Amino acid sequence: MREIVHVQGGQCGNQIGAKFWEVISDEHGVDPTGTYHGDSDLQLERINVYYNEATGGRYVPRAVLMDLEPGTMDSVRAGPFGQLFRPDNFVFGQTGAGNNWAKGHYTEGAELIDSVLDVVRKEAEGCDCLQGFQITHSLGGGTGSGMGTLLISKIREEYPDRIMETFSVFPSPKVSDTVVEPYNATLSVHQLVENADEVMVIDNEALYDICFRTLKLTTPTYGDLNHLVSACISGVTSCLRFPGQLNSDLRKLAVNLIPFPRLHFFMVGFAPLTSRGSQQYRALTVPELTQQMFDAKNMMCASDPRHGRYLTASAMFRGRMSTKEVDEQMLNVQNKNSSYFVEWIPNNIKSSVCDIPPKGLKLASTFIGNSTAIQEMFKRVAEQFTAMFRRKAFLHWYTGEGMDEMEFTEAESNMNDLVSEYQQYQDATAEEEGEYVEDEDEMDGM
């Protein structure tokens, strides 16, 4: 079977992860003690994508939980599904990274990383046919960003041919948790460009907007935000876990979504958006799902896809529907909005269909888009980074942990390169490919 090893790191990663396991357990009919109480054999058929079967028929998440302080893990353990996890798979330090990327990547995190790798290795060895790793973390703090990227590079060394997929929470434009977010995020992106295969870009502000605007929640909690993220993670892997007419897996996703190796930062969306607890009263149709899925207000990161063009996109539909209708809708989207898709990649939307919808819905869909508009996120972080770095503000916290200014400069230029690469393909047209003369003129005009 195609197993996935799930790793969650830092406060944000552990909170998203905990929510994700609630959603997945619900889909597979697993209760908080790990006992199966489902109503359909399909729930068990490929349950081993995310679960190991333990003695007495209990199902245990194939999850590794890491943090540099015990706090968040204690609350996960005390949470509704806390008893589900394997106790040995909690790996934590006592010091904390104090929102400092260098502590997570070079000092505190480096001391703990081997114990994390031991657990990862043990989980990977128990797999029949390991598909890859999925990691939930944030890029603004110290542990998820610093230690998270350290773990990614270590796993990359040991399992070079497995897919590495991350769900990364980027710093929000208006809401900032910590002053040094731009530093931590830039240093992390520098790593993710090189070592991750697929990065799903999420950001709290966009999630707040969705809760506020679409779900009409007046005071959204992190629980509500994480619920949205979980719906996406669950949708991405639904084809691995349930039978479908058009299957996809992490590798097919990568092949279809990544035209150039560095451009693997995706926007994600989910439809239909329903608030927790309010079930949908009328079933959506495939055209309505498609409409909502491609809506800019539906994107879980603060970039507007209308400001760029889609290089590629992927739609995963769940529920009983005709594949013909799905194909028609996908073509329809491309024809109606052709200016938002690059014309030098024809038919650039991949669709897959999984027969089993999420709990409580008849039809649902998950959207993943590789849009050049994502450069807005990077630009925003880069501006904040440069503003502080020019004055060397807060830098002593990083150099004190043994970091070199050089690494900051490299990270900065790597991120700026990424932005220009996205811009270059946004401007490219079908005729120009191969005619370098015009390219040069364009560069002058920029």
Swiss-Prot record:
One of its GO terms (cellular component) is cytoplasm. This is Tubulin beta chain. Belongs to the tubulin family. Residues 429-446 have a biased composition (Acidic residues). Residues 426-446 are annotated as: Disordered. InterPro entries: Beta-tubulin_BS, Beta_tubulin, Tub_FtsZ_C, Tubulin, Tubulin/FtsZ-like_C, Tubulin/FtsZ_2-layer-sand-dom, Tubulin/FtsZ_GTPase_sf, Tubulin_C. It comes from Euplotes crassus. Dimer of alpha and beta chains. A typical microtubule is a hollow water-filled tube with an outer diameter of 25 nm and an inner diameter of 15 nM. Alpha-beta heterodimers associate head-to-tail to form protofilaments running lengthwise along the microtubule wall with the beta-tubulin subunit facing the microtubule plus end conferring a structural polarity. Microtubules usually have 13 protofilaments but different protofilament numbers can be found in some organisms and specialized cells. Tubulin is the major constituent of microtubules, a cylinder consisting of laterally associated linear protofilaments composed of alpha- and beta-tubulin heterodimers. Microtubules grow by the addition of GTP-tubulin dimers to the microtubule end, where a stabilizing cap forms. Below the cap, tubulin dimers are in GDP-bound state, owing to GTPase activity of alpha-tubulin. PROSITE patterns: TUBULIN, TUBULIN_B_AUTOREG. One of its GO terms (biological process) is microtubule-based process. It is found in: Cytoplasm, Cytoskeleton.
